[in-house]
Curated annotation (Swiss-Prot):
Keyword Magnesium: no
Cross-referenced InterPro entries: SAICAR_synt/ADE2_N, SAICAR_synth, SAICAR_synthetase_CS
Species: Xanthomonas oryzae pv. oryzae (strain KACC10331 / KXO85)
Descriptive protein name: Phosphoribosylaminoimidazole-succinocarboxamide synthase
Catalytic activity of the protein: 5-amino-1-(5-phospho-D-ribosyl)imidazole-4-carboxylate + L-aspartate + ATP = (2S)-2-[5-amino-1-(5-phospho-beta-D-ribosyl)imidazole-4-carboxamido]succinate + ADP + phosphate + 2 H(+)
E.C. number: 6.3.2.6
GO BP: 'de novo' IMP biosynthetic process
Gene3D superfamilies in UniProt: ATP-grasp fold, B domain, Phosphorylase Kinase, domain 1
Lineage: Bacteria, Pseudomonadati, Pseudomonadota, Gammaproteobacteria, Lysobacterales
GO cellular component, one term: cytoplasm
Taxonomic superkingdom: Bacteria
Length: 310
């Protein structure tokens, strides 16, 4: 899969920009841009750019091809798990909705047309191992998101059972905060909270088993969900990518450490060496950090989905 032109920001005349996130640009698709046989409803064009964020700050340097790799990993998992949970993808090709004069090749592997859904205002996180903010919470309280865990667990230890630990959904530049299930119920209601929790753990277990067959441990992952006008629940945005998940090479896993992962760890490690206040604007990245980060995303795509990047 050759990498096409690097894309830091997408601008598509005629498609109203709905949201520009840390990585994705989301556009409304006017009805007259849709194919005549498109089912009734509203649709979005979601573009995965090559932007990279760290510590909730979007950095000035892109990772070439990152958006394409993220999109392909997401699409792989959306199709792999559609027997478990409906997702936001629809059968409308990207080139059918792009404005005239826009090169379809630039967007073919980094964009998707999706249903327009009402987002559930909570991040849905599944954890199978004790790491990251969960490890910090456990050290301080013996719990994660109000869930009592056994005493004496070590960093990166596999949990007795996967757990659901929701968090707030912060705006770009702000930080998500872990909340307990009761707080989620107060936000979205008991029935929807239970559906999201059950779907999150169901997908996580399936994905963790599949990843293990590829020699990869899925330590934790974050999902976003949305509902349609009839209240049907969908998984949306991205799915089980190296940006939303913590993947560890199984042969490098070591209890009591923070194992290496298929993500932007090289970037975080480099930034920790700088005298930078972790606020915008972010610093530029050396070429070797960019190259090594790109290689990690490419390896994850190859090992999970069998898709090679030239």
């Amino acid at each position: 899969m050759p990498v096409s032109t690097t894309l830091l920001q997408s601008d598509l005349p005629g498609l109203p920009l709905r949201h520009r996130g840390k990585v994705r640009d989301v556009f409304d698709i006017p009805r007259d841009r849709l194919p005549a046989d498109a089912p009734p409803g509203d649709y979005l064009l979601m573009v995965a750019t090559d932007r990279l964020s760290a510590f909730d700050v979007v950095l000035p340097d892109p990772i070439p091809g990152k958006g394409e790799m993220l999109c392909q990993v997401s699409n792989f998992w959306f199709h792999k798990t559609e027997h478990l949970m409906p997702n936001h993808l629809v059968d409308i090709r990207v080139e059918q909705v792009l404005p005239e004069g826009v090169d379809p090749a630039l967007y073919a592997k980094r964009a998707v047309v999706t249903r327009k859904l009402k987002p559930v205002p909570v991040e849905a996180i599944a954890r199978g191992y004790l790491i990251g903010s969960g490890w910090k919470d456990y050290q301080r309280t013996g719990k994660i998101s109000g869930i009592e865990l056994p005493d004496g667990l070590r960093q990166a230890e596999k949990l007795p059972e996967p757990i659901f630990t929701p968090s707030t959904k912060a705006a770009v530049g702000d930080h998500d905060e872990n909340i307990d299930f009761d707080a989620m119920v107060k936000t979205v209601g008991a029935e929807l909270a239970e559906r999201v929790r059950d779907a999150t753990l169901r997908i996580y277990r399936f994905a963790a088993d599949f990843a293990a067959e590829c020699g990869i441990l899925l330590a934790d992952t974050k999902f976003e969900f949305g509902t349609d006008a009839d209240g049907r629940l969908y998984v949306m945005d991205e799915m089980l990518t190296p940006d939303s998940s913590r993947y560890w090479p199984a042969d490098q896993y070591e209890l009591g450490t923070s194992p290496p992962s298929y993500d932007k760890q090289f970037v975080r490690d480099y930034l920790e060496t700088l005298d930078w206040g972790k606020t915008a604007p972010g610093p530029s990245l050396p070429a070797d950090v960019i190259d090594r980060t790109r290689a990690k995303y490419a390896e994850a795509l190859q090992r999970l989905a069998g898709i090679s990047v030239d």
